[in-house]
Amino acid sequence: MAKKTHKMGVAAGIVVIVAVVIFVRMMINVKTYRYSTVDTVLRNPLIGFAPNADYFDAVGDNTLVYVDVTWRELEPEEGVFDFASIEEENFLDTWRASGKNVVFRFVCDEPSDEEHMDIPDWLYEKTDDGIFYDTDYGKGYSPDYSNETFIAYHAKAVEELGKRYGGDSFFCYIELGSVGHWGEWHVKYEDGIKRLPSEDTLRKYVEPYISAFPNAKLLMRRPFSYVSEYDLGVFNDMTGHARDTMEWLSWIEEGGIYSEPEQPMELIAVPKVWESAPVGGEFTSEYSMEEMLTDRLDGTLKLLSKSHMTFAGPMCPIADEDEKDYPDEVYQVLKRLGYRYGISECVMTDIKLTGQLSVRLTVNNYGTAPIYFDWHMFVYLMDGSGNAIKRYDTGVDLTEICGQESADVKLNITGDDRKHLLNGTYSLAVGIENPDTGMPQVQLDMNAENMDGYFFLN
């Protein structure tokens, strides 16, 4: 009798367990969606190639353009800033209207084949203590960067640039710029050009940019102390040149001493600079673009990956030539420039007892660097016509998801929104919005139906 009672108890227990399982399954419904990556070029904002803005046909589908301006072009007469000519020559109204952004560099000395000055005549007359040079770099005029009059007028010029272009993120990356040949913070002192001044004096060329461009990310050619002090990025104008790039990477990873100024300056080790500030630059002119995209492609790709670069220009493959001739090679390069976000998994858990639909997304960055601007990822309720009815901020900080990293985000949907999703009236989509437009503008690396930046999850 005891055995029979025991068996009946066990059976009853099993019935209860089965009933609970059935009840839970009826009350909780879980759907999992997975998305593979896509093997295609993604022309996303704020990353990629930055061809010269004044070469219209070179730009194509690229989202960045490069503009450099000499002081002579900017301020031909004291206090008179010729923005109109700069904007016309570089098609800035066109690029702004088409949603592109600018990589900018202000230059005081750009060597060329002819004798010339890149500072205005009026400033030369007020200072007149630089030197005209003729070296294997070319010909030009190197100002005395320790001249306090020159420094004061430089601060005013950068201030005016900021008033014109620093109010939004159209000018998104500012390369400093200002000092040395091509704005690269070096001069050919061995040919008689006066060395750069001390670190404290050179600081006066950095500080005006900090206040003038609060919405942009600033970059320097070398990791001087200002890089860590002001959270600046870095740029390499010898990308693709193995020896020079490895030397540049050694500065980033280990620091060192920069002996060119009149007083040697310390280079600060910033091995993780790319995690919080952009790395840019351009391809070396030592080799042809054809050579870098063919015989030297493997080495170039490895250097790009090690550098965690976000953009390259103006020396870069251009749309109407290189991109047409070497599409596969260009794609390999672009894959190694900047972010490449995508959703790999979406889990929707509906709990009937609580009336709550939980959505968990796994956000991946398949690229080599994060985005450096405060762009938000949203989940959208989409109606049958493809209109976004409502949006939910996922709260994920995309700037913290570095290259080859991922993060899970969760959100809960209740009420009528949940009902419309469950009965199929609405569907879910995900997108990354440009805060300037309030619209999703990032192509995600995920194999999912998409429309105008909305990527459907179910």
Language model segments and positions:
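N-terminal Sec-pathway targeting helices
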Residues: 2-17
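Hydrophobic alpha-helical membrane-insertion segments, chiefly the h-region
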Residues: 17-27
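Non-catalytic accessory regions flanking glycosidase/transglycosidase catalytic cores in CAZymes
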Residues: 28-94, 166, 170, 354, ...
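N-terminal substrate-binding region of glycoside hydrolase catalytic domains
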Residues: 30-150, 266-305, 309-325
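Catalytic-core regions of glycoside hydrolase
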Residues: 33-54, 96, 173-182, 188-318
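Conserved, mostly hydrophobic/aromatic
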Residues: 65, 161, 174, 209, ...
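Active-site groove signature of glycoside hydrolases
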Residues: 130-150, 157-193
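Extracellular/luminal regions of secreted and cell-surface proteins that mediate adhesion/ECM remodeling
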Residues: 333-458
